[in-house]
Structure formats: structure tokens, C-alpha cells
Amino acid sequence: MKLLLLLCLELTLVYVHAEEASSEGQNLNVEKINGKWFSILLASDKREKIEEHGTMRVFVEHIDVLENSLAFKFHTVIDEECTEIYLVADKTEKAGEYSVTYDGFNTFTILKTDYDNYIMFHLINKKDEENFQLMELFGREPDLSSDIKEKFAKLCEEHGIVRENIIDLSNANRCLQARE
């Protein structure tokens, strides 16, 4: 009987540890996303936006959680040089949604995170009467497991983004040398 109780306790602890959060759910603790991140995968239904020289091909360095907003420090490659970009995204009236102006008007949500390893974003960009989707997978380390990458790919498909439009940045020039 003691062994059975111990097994139940262990399974409960494993379940609690493996629990994921999203900004659409009630269990997101946004404070826990504060800190250093690396861009791992980018996906879009407009692939040219995330290819080399695409306006949305940015590489995250840090997320700062502010009172009613999130501040992002990104890098991008312009004329073969790494350039810093600082963006502040404000909470919208919709629960779990943020907005920021960059190459158009963007709204985004956090689809999934486990805080310690990865975070997945879904963004909708509106510019000049046109819309496109962007999805991002960030990791706390420069690369992530194939299981997490597959989970991201399935989420992309659920949002109508084909696998051919997912770019793995783990071997790309992500301006790592420009990080502090």
C-alpha cells in the first residue's frame, strides 16, 4: 500500500512539473518568462518574411516583463551587420494578448511555455490591408530537443502554416556574438 501511495505521489509530481502554460489559459505566470532566450524556429504563412533579409527574421536575446507590457531585445542582420532592436509590446483588452508596432501592427499570444526550456508565440501582422501569421519558438539554450521542435511544428500546422515554412535557426547566424 505504501508503495502504491508513493507511486501516486511521484506521478502527481511529474504531472505538475510537466504542466504547460499559455496566455489563453488561466495558468500563465508571465513573470517566469523574464530573462535570456534564443530564437530556435520561425514559421510563417508568408515565408519570405522570415527568410534571410526578411523583415521578421529577428533573433531574441532577452524578454523583460514590465507592469503591463513585455520588452523584447532582438537582433537582426542588416547589410551583414548585427543590429539591435528594442520593442515594447503592450497588453491589449483581450486576455493574454499583446500588441506592438513593427513592420505593421502586430498582436500576439503565448501558445505554450514550460518557462525553463521553451516558449512558443503566435503573432498576426496587419499591414496595408494584408495579414500574415508568424510563429516563434524560443529556447533558454541555443538549441532544443527534436520533441519540442515537433510539438511546435504540429502547432504551426494547426494554425495553417505548412512545415516547409518552418525555418530552423539553430545553425543560422543569430547574431550570438552581439549578445551581451
From Swiss-Prot:
Give disulfide pairs as residue numbers. 82-175
Keywords for this protein: Behavior, Disulfide bond, Pheromone-binding, Secreted, Signal, Transport
Q: Check the record and name the InterPro entries matching this protein.
A: Calycin, Lipocalin, Lipocalin_CS, Lipocln_cytosolic_FA-bd_dom, Maj_urinary
Cited PROSITE patterns:
LIPOCALIN
Gene Ontology CC terms: cytosol; extracellular space; nucleus
**Secretion signal: which residues?**
1-18
Q: Which GO terms describe its biological process?
A: aerobic respiration; cellular response to lipid; energy reserve metabolic process; glucose homeostasis; heat generation; locomotor rhythm; mitochondrion organization; negative regulation of DNA-templated transcription
| Gene3D superfamilies attached to this UniProt entry | 2.40.128.20
Q: Name one Pfam family in it.
A: Lipocalin
GO terms for MF:
insulin receptor activity; pheromone binding; small molecule binding
Query: Does the entry feature the keyword Cell inner membrane, yes or no?
Result: no
Enumerate the subcellular locations listed in this protein's record, separating them with semicolons: Secreted
Q: What highest taxon heads this organism's lineage?
A: Eukaryota
Reported function = Major urinary proteins (Mups) bind pheromones, and thus stabilize them to allow slow release into the air from urine marks. May protect pheromones from oxidation. May also act as pheromones themselves. In this context, they play a role in the regulation of social behaviors, such as aggression, mating, pup-suckling, territory establishment and dominance.
UniProt family annotation: Belongs to the calycin superfamily. Lipocalin family.
What is the protein's given name? Major urinary protein 5
Species this chain originates from: Mus musculus (Mouse)
Q: Upper lineage ranks?
A: Eukaryota, Metazoa, Chordata, Craniata, Vertebrata
